[in-house]
Amino acid sequence: CTILCGEIGKHLIEGIADGFVPGIIERHRALLDEVITVESAEAVQEMRRLAQKHGLFVGPSSGAHMIAARKLRERHKIEHVVTFFCDKGEKYINDYWL
């Protein structure tokens, strides 16, 4: 909820909803057309799917990116969406995450 309402919320995704709002969002909030929410459990599940199906060793924020890109594509009936996976999976090598 940080980006939507500026409040700290519960999460499993480092850097999301922990009180941190990126400066670029603060400066350009009026330009946002839409904010897509992704539950932590969904993001972790997608992180696992990306590793198992595509061999992409990423973290849960990348799982959230993938889900948001998929939702964006479906909502707006667009063919291609580009996103960046900006985290690595090495921090998440333990039974809790895998």
Task: Map each language-model feature to its residues.
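Phosphate-binding loop/pocket of nucleotide- and phosphate-handling active sites
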Residues: K10, D18-G19, G23-I25, I67-L98
